[in-house]
Swiss-Prot record:
It comes from Azorhizobium caulinodans (strain ATCC 43989 / DSM 5975 / JCM 20966 / LMG 6465 / NBRC 14845 / NCIMB 13405 / ORS 571). One of its GO terms (molecular function) is structural constituent of ribosome. This is Small ribosomal subunit protein bS6. The lineage of its organism: Bacteria, Pseudomonadati, Pseudomonadota, Alphaproteobacteria, Hyphomicrobiales. GO terms for biological process: translation. Residues 99-150 are annotated as: Disordered. NCBIfam families: S6.
Amino acid sequence: MSLYEHVFLVRQDVTAQQVEELAARFKGVIEANGGTVSKVEAWGVKSLTYRIKKNRKAHFTLFNIDAPAAAVQEMERQMGIDEDVLRFLTIRVDELEEGPSAMLQKRDRDDRGERGERGFGGGGFGGGRDREDRPRRGRDREEAATEETF
């Protein structure tokens, strides 16, 4: 049996529960044909780079599959028939990744939030210094002298 990574996109107006039901149905197709699905990851709703069948967003789902080619072909055939599935892509791999995929790791990184206040200058222009940290020169000195007289 061969190892595959399979990603499919489902229309955005389908509920998350219906996406799970679709994933379970396609997983059942693989298992009925002598294969196994070792990992199912729901990546959630993401924006598409371009419109696919008049949709700008889609539910993304990943399968890690260990199955014969006939099982994967049958699953792809059924996905092609299903109106809710916008696109799918199956890639044969030498070994399956353990742990969360790169997309889930990216989402975890994005969920960390702000980094907060930094102890040093904070970067950017000026390094956190105000103009009062250095002596005035030229035109600035003249403006400062007129400000102090009022």
